[in-house]
């Protein structure tokens, strides 16, 4: 991993929301004029979409990883293509719930992990945008999202228990609602705590082979190539 200094506007004591806007703006130079850009999901990506409005007439459009991002892109006048209409994307811009010093990530806090992984796989470069709190030594402190087919959820939870993890079915509107969250793909999400993921590649490969797992929120095979990190001294650029 190499690191480059910031070259983006910065002021001291920025809020987390301001840092998200800063890294969203910092991602714009990675967008090639005339291209179709891959766009992820989440609060930091929303700031990138807002910044992308300034160059909407210089790109051909976007491929989005969620219904929410599609609606936000269309609201500012950016054409959204279906992933099946595009063979390859130059760049994919998305956030992370955790990222380590090798560019491996945990993603899926916004429940869009499967589509995020699909769009990332179509892209030549993955640019992660995040604040410095997301940079970790070892993945696993953030609850690991796993998209599952509902009929397999209990069995998969037991498999995680055998690894030392505790899986909880994500609820729509919070745990008190009792109603399972349904993803854009019509599936459910397990959030798994108590894991230390020291071998992200091996872990992703292992869990993705369990029957009923749609995808696990470890992004090791689709790792970040660059991370723009909103830090106490501005934007740090990490290159993996």
UniProtKB/Swiss-Prot annotation:
Superkingdom per UniProt: Bacteria
EC assignment: 5.3.1.6
Subunit: Homodimer.
UniProt keyword annotations, A-Z: Isomerase
Gene Ontology molecular function terms on file: ribose-5-phosphate isomerase activity
Name of the featured protein: Ribose-5-phosphate isomerase A
Catalytic site: 116
Catalytic activity as recorded in UniProt: aldehydo-D-ribose 5-phosphate = D-ribulose 5-phosphate
Chain residues that bind substrate: 41-44, 94-97, 107-110, 134
Function as written in the Swiss-Prot or TrEMBL entry: Catalyzes the reversible conversion of ribose-5-phosphate to ribulose 5-phosphate.
HAMAP family: Rib_5P_isom_A
GO cellular component: cytosol
Pfam families according to UniProt: Rib_5-P_isom_A
Pathway: Carbohydrate degradation; pentose phosphate pathway; D-ribose 5-phosphate from D-ribulose 5-phosphate (non-oxidative stage): step 1/1
GO BP: D-ribose metabolic process; pentose-phosphate shunt, non-oxidative branch
Family designation: Belongs to the ribose 5-phosphate isomerase family.
PANTHER family found in the cross-reference section: RIBOSE-5-PHOSPHATE ISOMERASE
């Amino acid at each position: 991993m190499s690191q480059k200094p910031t070259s983006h506007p910065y002021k001291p004591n920025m809020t987390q929301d301001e840092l998200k806007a800063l890294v969203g703006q910092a991602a714009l130079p990675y967008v090639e004029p005339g291209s179709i850009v891959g766009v992820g999901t989440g609060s930091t990506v929303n700031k990138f979409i807002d910044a992308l409005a300034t160059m909407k007439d210089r790109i051909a459009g976007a491929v989005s990883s969620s219904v929410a991002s599609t609606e936000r892109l269309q609201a500012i006048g950016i054409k959204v293509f279906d992933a099946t209409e595009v063979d390859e994307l130059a760049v994919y811009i998305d956030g992370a719930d955790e990222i380590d010093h090798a560019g491996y990530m945990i993603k899926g806090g916004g429940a869009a992990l499967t589509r995020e992984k699909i769009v990332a796989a179509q892209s030549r470069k993955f640019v992660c945008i995040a604040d410095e709190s997301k940079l970790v030594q070892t993945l696993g402190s953030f609850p690991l999202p796993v998209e599952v087919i509902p009929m397999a959820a209990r069995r998969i939870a037991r498999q995680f228990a055998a690894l030392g993890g505790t899986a909880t079915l994500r609820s729509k509107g919070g745990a008190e609602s009792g109603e399972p969250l349904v993803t854009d793909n019509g599936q459910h999400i397990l959030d798994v705590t108590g894991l230390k993921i020291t071998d992200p590649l091996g872990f992703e490969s292992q869990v993705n082979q369990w029957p009923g797992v749609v995808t696990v929120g470890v992004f090791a095979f689709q790792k970040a190539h660059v991370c723009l990190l909103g830090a106490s001294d501005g934007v740090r650029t990490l290159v993996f």
